Protein backbone atom coordinates (compact mmCIF):
# COMPACT_ATOMS: atom_id res chain seq x y z
CA UNK A 1 0.00 0.00 0.00
CA UNK A 2 1.15 3.57 -0.70
CA UNK A 3 2.73 4.91 2.50
CA UNK A 4 0.88 8.21 2.04
CA UNK A 5 -2.49 6.49 2.46
CA UNK A 6 -4.27 4.99 5.45
CA UNK A 7 -5.80 1.50 5.38
CA UNK A 8 -8.97 2.93 3.79
CA UNK A 9 -7.08 4.54 0.91
CA UNK A 10 -7.40 8.10 2.23
CA UNK A 11 -4.55 10.59 2.37
CA UNK A 12 -2.55 10.56 5.58
CA UNK A 13 0.43 12.50 4.19
CA UNK A 14 1.09 14.16 0.83
CA UNK A 15 4.68 13.40 -0.15
CA UNK A 16 4.67 12.59 -3.88
CA UNK A 17 2.32 12.25 -6.83
CA UNK A 18 3.99 8.97 -7.77
CA UNK A 19 1.71 5.97 -7.40
CA UNK A 20 -1.43 7.86 -6.40
CA UNK A 21 -4.56 6.35 -7.99
CA UNK A 22 -6.44 8.40 -10.56
CA UNK A 23 -9.64 8.69 -8.46
CA UNK A 24 -7.63 10.25 -5.62
CA UNK A 25 -5.84 12.67 -7.96
CA UNK A 26 -9.23 13.73 -9.32
CA UNK A 27 -10.61 14.05 -5.80
CA UNK A 28 -7.84 16.53 -4.98
CA UNK A 29 -8.72 18.56 -8.10
CA UNK A 30 -12.46 18.39 -7.39
CA UNK A 31 -11.89 19.53 -3.80
CA UNK A 32 -9.72 22.41 -5.01
CA UNK A 33 -12.54 23.43 -7.34
CA UNK A 34 -14.87 23.67 -4.35
CA UNK A 35 -12.55 26.22 -2.73
CA UNK A 36 -12.23 28.57 -5.71
CA UNK A 37 -15.44 30.28 -4.64
CA UNK A 38 -14.02 30.94 -1.18
CA UNK A 39 -10.96 32.63 -2.65
CA UNK A 40 -13.17 35.03 -4.60
CA UNK A 41 -15.24 36.18 -1.60
CA UNK A 42 -14.70 39.38 0.36
CA UNK A 43 -14.30 37.24 3.50
CA UNK A 44 -11.94 34.52 2.36
CA UNK A 45 -12.33 32.10 5.27
CA UNK A 46 -14.09 28.88 6.15
CA UNK A 47 -13.94 27.26 9.62
CA UNK A 48 -12.88 23.76 8.58
CA UNK A 49 -9.58 23.72 10.46
CA UNK A 50 -10.44 25.97 13.38
CA UNK A 51 -8.38 24.85 16.37
CA UNK A 52 -5.81 23.02 14.20
CA UNK A 53 -2.15 24.06 14.07
CA UNK A 54 0.08 23.91 10.98
CA UNK A 55 3.85 24.42 11.24
CA UNK A 56 5.81 25.56 8.19
CA UNK A 57 9.35 24.13 8.24
CA UNK A 58 11.22 25.69 5.31
CA UNK A 59 14.92 24.83 5.19
CA UNK A 60 15.17 26.41 1.71
CA UNK A 61 14.04 29.90 0.67
CA UNK A 62 10.62 30.23 -0.90
CA UNK A 63 8.19 33.01 -1.76
CA UNK A 64 5.21 31.54 -3.65
CA UNK A 65 5.12 28.13 -1.98
CA UNK A 66 5.46 29.31 1.61
CA UNK A 67 3.06 32.22 1.14
CA UNK A 68 0.35 30.13 -0.51
CA UNK A 69 0.65 27.40 2.13
CA UNK A 70 0.26 30.03 4.84
CA UNK A 71 -2.71 31.62 3.07
CA UNK A 72 -4.31 28.21 2.51
CA UNK A 73 -4.07 27.30 6.19
CA UNK A 74 -5.31 30.66 7.48
CA UNK A 75 -8.23 30.65 5.04
CA UNK A 76 -9.23 27.30 6.53
CA UNK A 77 -9.03 29.03 9.97
CA UNK A 78 -6.00 27.04 11.15
CA UNK A 79 -3.28 28.56 13.31
CA UNK A 80 0.02 28.81 11.44
CA UNK A 81 3.56 28.90 12.82
CA UNK A 82 6.51 29.73 10.57
CA UNK A 83 9.78 28.38 11.94
CA UNK A 84 12.82 30.44 10.97
CA UNK A 85 15.27 27.59 10.56
CA UNK A 86 18.24 29.96 10.31
CA UNK A 87 17.74 31.03 13.95
CA UNK A 88 16.14 27.81 15.23
CA UNK A 89 17.72 25.32 17.61
CA UNK A 90 18.83 23.30 14.56
CA UNK A 91 21.29 26.06 13.77
CA UNK A 92 22.70 25.39 17.26
CA UNK A 93 23.34 21.74 16.52
CA UNK A 94 20.00 20.11 17.34
CA UNK A 95 19.18 17.13 15.11
CA UNK A 96 16.20 17.21 12.77
CA UNK A 97 14.54 14.42 14.73
CA UNK A 98 15.00 16.20 18.08
CA UNK A 99 13.61 19.38 16.58
CA UNK A 100 10.63 17.43 15.28
CA UNK A 101 9.96 15.83 18.67
CA UNK A 102 9.97 19.21 20.40
CA UNK A 103 7.60 20.74 17.87
CA UNK A 104 5.30 17.72 18.16
CA UNK A 105 5.20 18.23 21.92
CA UNK A 106 3.48 21.56 21.19
CA UNK A 107 0.52 19.53 19.85
CA UNK A 108 0.67 20.58 16.20
CA UNK A 109 -1.45 18.80 13.59
CA UNK A 110 0.63 19.12 10.42
CA UNK A 111 4.09 19.95 9.15
CA UNK A 112 4.70 21.61 5.79
CA UNK A 113 8.31 20.76 4.92
CA UNK A 114 10.72 22.11 2.31
CA UNK A 115 14.28 20.79 2.41
CA UNK A 116 17.28 20.58 0.12
CA UNK A 117 17.76 16.84 0.69
CA UNK A 118 15.62 14.30 -1.15
CA UNK A 119 13.58 12.12 1.17
CA UNK A 120 13.41 14.54 4.11
CA UNK A 121 9.61 14.88 4.03
CA UNK A 122 9.22 11.10 3.93
CA UNK A 123 11.69 10.76 6.83
CA UNK A 124 9.63 13.17 8.92
CA UNK A 125 6.40 11.38 7.94
CA UNK A 126 7.84 8.09 9.20
CA UNK A 127 8.64 9.58 12.60
CA UNK A 128 5.63 11.76 13.43
CA UNK A 129 3.06 10.47 15.89
CA UNK A 130 -0.26 9.12 14.58
CA UNK A 131 -2.65 11.90 13.67
CA UNK A 132 0.04 14.32 12.46
CA UNK A 133 0.23 14.89 8.71
CA UNK A 134 3.21 15.92 6.58
CA UNK A 135 2.95 17.89 3.33
CA UNK A 136 5.99 17.94 1.08
CA UNK A 137 6.71 21.47 -0.14
CA UNK A 138 9.75 20.28 -2.10
CA UNK A 139 12.62 17.94 -1.20
CA UNK A 140 15.88 18.05 -3.13
CA UNK A 141 15.48 16.76 -6.68
CA UNK A 142 12.86 14.26 -5.58
CA UNK A 143 9.39 15.81 -5.58
CA UNK A 144 7.25 18.94 -5.37
CA UNK A 145 3.79 17.36 -5.39
CA UNK A 146 1.65 20.37 -4.48
CA UNK A 147 3.19 22.35 -7.36
CA UNK A 148 2.34 19.48 -9.69
CA UNK A 149 -1.26 19.37 -8.47
CA UNK A 150 -1.80 23.10 -8.89
CA UNK A 151 -0.41 22.69 -12.40
CA UNK A 152 -2.87 19.84 -13.05
CA UNK A 153 -5.70 21.98 -11.69
CA UNK A 154 -4.74 24.83 -14.02
CA UNK A 155 -4.56 22.48 -17.01
CA UNK A 156 -7.97 21.01 -16.20
CA UNK A 157 -9.52 24.47 -15.95
CA UNK A 158 -8.36 25.26 -19.49
CA UNK A 159 -8.42 21.87 -21.21
CA UNK A 160 -10.86 19.63 -19.33
CA UNK A 161 -10.07 15.98 -20.03
CA UNK A 162 -6.41 14.95 -19.82
CA UNK A 163 -6.62 11.96 -22.16
CA UNK A 164 -6.33 13.78 -25.52
CA UNK A 165 -3.60 16.16 -24.36
CA UNK A 166 -0.02 16.42 -25.55
CA UNK A 167 2.08 18.08 -22.85
CA UNK A 168 5.68 19.25 -23.24
CA UNK A 169 7.95 19.89 -20.24
CA UNK A 170 10.93 22.00 -21.28
CA UNK A 171 14.22 22.80 -19.60
CA UNK A 172 16.27 21.59 -16.66
CA UNK A 173 14.66 18.18 -16.13
CA UNK A 174 17.76 16.81 -14.40
CA UNK A 175 17.58 19.05 -11.34
CA UNK A 176 13.82 19.61 -11.25
CA UNK A 177 11.67 18.08 -8.52
CA UNK A 178 8.74 19.83 -10.20
CA UNK A 179 9.25 17.92 -13.47
CA UNK A 180 9.23 14.53 -11.76
CA UNK A 181 6.03 15.33 -9.89
CA UNK A 182 4.41 16.74 -13.04
CA UNK A 183 5.27 13.60 -15.02
CA UNK A 184 3.83 11.26 -12.37
CA UNK A 185 0.67 13.37 -12.06
CA UNK A 186 0.14 13.66 -15.83
CA UNK A 187 0.58 9.93 -16.34
CA UNK A 188 -1.62 9.20 -13.34
CA UNK A 189 -4.39 11.37 -14.80
CA UNK A 190 -4.08 9.66 -18.18
CA UNK A 191 -2.53 12.41 -20.31
CA UNK A 192 -2.27 11.30 -23.93
CA UNK A 193 1.44 12.06 -24.34
CA UNK A 194 4.05 13.57 -22.06
CA UNK A 195 7.16 14.96 -23.74
CA UNK A 196 10.36 16.31 -22.26
CA UNK A 197 12.55 18.72 -24.22
CA UNK A 198 16.07 19.44 -23.02
CA UNK A 199 19.75 19.20 -23.90
CA UNK A 200 21.25 15.82 -23.05
CA UNK A 201 23.23 17.34 -20.18
CA UNK A 202 19.99 18.38 -18.43
CA UNK A 203 18.20 15.03 -18.63
CA UNK A 204 18.41 12.24 -16.03
CA UNK A 205 19.73 8.97 -17.40
CA UNK A 206 16.54 7.09 -16.55
CA UNK A 207 14.14 9.71 -17.95
CA UNK A 208 12.53 7.36 -20.50
CA UNK A 209 11.52 4.95 -17.71
CA UNK A 210 9.19 7.68 -16.43
CA UNK A 211 6.87 7.21 -19.39
CA UNK A 212 7.82 10.20 -21.53
CA UNK A 213 9.01 10.91 -25.08
CA UNK A 214 12.37 12.64 -25.20
CA UNK A 215 13.22 15.47 -27.60
CA UNK A 216 16.39 17.53 -27.91
CA UNK A 217 15.00 19.87 -30.58
CA UNK A 218 12.41 22.49 -29.56
CA UNK A 219 10.61 22.65 -32.89
CA UNK A 220 10.10 18.89 -33.02
CA UNK A 221 9.13 18.64 -29.36
CA UNK A 222 6.63 21.50 -29.40
CA UNK A 223 4.83 20.45 -32.55
CA UNK A 224 1.06 20.22 -31.93
CA UNK A 225 1.33 20.27 -28.12
CA UNK A 226 -1.58 21.56 -26.03
CA UNK A 227 0.40 22.55 -22.93
CA UNK A 228 3.95 23.89 -22.62
CA UNK A 229 5.44 23.68 -19.13
CA UNK A 230 8.70 25.62 -18.88
CA UNK A 231 11.21 24.99 -16.09
CA UNK A 232 13.76 27.22 -14.41
CA UNK A 233 17.46 26.62 -14.94
CA UNK A 234 18.59 25.59 -11.46
CA UNK A 235 22.12 26.96 -11.41
CA UNK A 236 22.34 26.47 -7.64
CA UNK A 237 22.08 22.68 -8.10
CA UNK A 238 24.41 22.39 -11.09
CA UNK A 239 27.92 21.03 -10.77
CA UNK A 240 30.26 21.49 -13.68
CA UNK A 241 29.72 23.04 -17.10
CA UNK A 242 26.34 21.63 -18.14
CA UNK A 243 25.60 24.62 -20.39
CA UNK A 244 27.81 26.71 -22.67
CA UNK A 245 26.03 29.94 -21.61
CA UNK A 246 22.58 31.23 -20.74
CA UNK A 247 22.50 33.07 -24.05
CA UNK A 248 23.17 29.88 -25.99
CA UNK A 249 20.55 28.07 -23.91
CA UNK A 250 17.94 30.71 -24.73
CA UNK A 251 18.79 30.49 -28.42
CA UNK A 252 18.09 26.74 -28.44
CA UNK A 253 15.54 26.21 -25.64
CA UNK A 254 14.16 29.59 -24.62
CA UNK A 255 10.48 29.95 -25.50
CA UNK A 256 9.63 32.63 -28.04
CA UNK A 257 6.55 33.30 -30.13
CA UNK A 258 8.42 31.95 -33.14
CA UNK A 259 9.18 28.62 -31.45
CA UNK A 260 5.64 28.49 -30.08
CA UNK A 261 4.15 28.80 -33.57
CA UNK A 262 4.40 25.02 -34.14
CA UNK A 263 2.32 24.22 -31.03
CA UNK A 264 -1.47 23.92 -31.07
CA UNK A 265 -3.03 27.37 -31.60
CA UNK A 266 -4.76 27.13 -28.20
CA UNK A 267 -1.70 25.88 -26.30
CA UNK A 268 -1.24 27.33 -22.83
CA UNK A 269 2.12 28.36 -21.35
CA UNK A 270 3.06 27.47 -17.77
CA UNK A 271 6.03 28.03 -15.46
CA UNK A 272 6.37 27.16 -11.74
CA UNK A 273 8.40 30.32 -11.08
CA UNK A 274 10.52 32.20 -10.54
CA UNK A 275 10.97 33.01 -14.23
CA UNK A 276 14.37 33.98 -15.62
CA UNK A 277 13.26 36.22 -18.48
CA UNK A 278 15.55 36.02 -21.45
CA UNK A 279 16.70 32.56 -20.37
CA UNK A 280 13.65 30.26 -20.20
CA UNK A 281 11.28 32.54 -22.13
CA UNK A 282 10.99 36.09 -23.32
CA UNK A 283 8.58 38.66 -21.91
CA UNK A 284 6.29 38.51 -24.94
CA UNK A 285 5.50 34.89 -24.09
CA UNK A 286 5.52 35.25 -20.29
CA UNK A 287 3.07 38.16 -20.43
CA UNK A 288 1.20 37.05 -23.54
CA UNK A 289 -2.41 35.91 -23.94
CA UNK A 290 -1.57 32.20 -23.70
CA UNK A 291 0.36 32.50 -20.44
CA UNK A 292 -1.44 31.13 -17.37
CA UNK A 293 1.51 31.63 -15.01
CA UNK A 294 -0.24 34.00 -12.60
CA UNK A 295 -3.30 31.76 -12.59
CA UNK A 296 -1.02 28.95 -11.40
CA UNK A 297 -0.08 31.08 -8.38
CA UNK A 298 -3.73 31.77 -7.55
CA UNK A 299 -4.61 28.10 -7.96
CA UNK A 300 -1.87 27.17 -5.51
CA UNK A 301 -4.04 28.49 -2.68
CA UNK A 302 -7.10 26.41 -3.64
CA UNK A 303 -5.08 23.24 -4.18
CA UNK A 304 -3.24 23.57 -0.87
CA UNK A 305 -6.54 24.31 0.89
CA UNK A 306 -7.89 21.12 -0.68
CA UNK A 307 -4.98 19.01 0.51
CA UNK A 308 -5.05 20.39 4.05
CA UNK A 309 -8.80 19.86 4.28
CA UNK A 310 -8.47 16.28 3.05
CA UNK A 311 -5.67 15.55 5.52
CA UNK A 312 -6.95 17.42 8.56
CA UNK A 313 -10.64 18.11 8.21
CA UNK A 314 -13.77 17.81 6.14
CA UNK A 315 -13.16 18.52 2.46
CA UNK A 316 -15.28 21.17 0.79
CA UNK A 317 -15.73 24.92 0.81
CA UNK A 318 -19.41 25.41 1.43
CA UNK A 319 -19.47 27.27 4.77
CA UNK A 320 -18.69 30.83 5.69
CA UNK A 321 -16.64 31.56 8.78
Curated annotation (Swiss-Prot):
Q: Where are the transmembrane segments?
A: none
Name its pathway: Pyrimidine metabolism; UMP biosynthesis via de novo pathway; (S)-dihydroorotate from bicarbonate: step 2/3
The protein's UniProt keywords, in alphabetical order, are:
Pyrimidine biosynthesis, Transferase
Which terms in the GO cellular component ontology are assigned? cytosol
What does the entry give for GO biological process? 'de novo' pyrimidine nucleobase biosynthetic process; 'de novo' UMP biosynthetic process; amino acid metabolic process
The residues that the entry says bind L-aspartate are 92, 177, 232
Q: Name one GO molecular function term.
A: amino acid binding
Q: Can you tell me which residues bind carbamoyl phosphate? A: 64-65, 114, 144, 147, 273-274
Which E.C. number(s) belong to this protein?
2.1.3.2
Catalytic activity entry:
carbamoyl phosphate + L-aspartate = N-carbamoyl-L-aspartate + phosphate + H(+)
Query: Which NCBIfam families does the record match to this protein?
Result: asp_carb_tr (TIGR00670), PRK00856.1 (NF002032)
Q: How does it assemble?
A: Heterododecamer (2C3:3R2) of six catalytic PyrB chains organized as two trimers (C3), and six regulatory PyrI chains organized as three dimers (R2).
Task performed by this protein: Catalyzes the condensation of carbamoyl phosphate and aspartate to form carbamoyl aspartate and inorganic phosphate, the committed step in the de novo pyrimidine nucleotide biosynthesis pathway.
Q: Which family does the record assign? A: Belongs to the aspartate/ornithine carbamoyltransferase superfamily. ATCase family.
Q: What is this protein called?
A: Aspartate carbamoyltransferase catalytic subunit
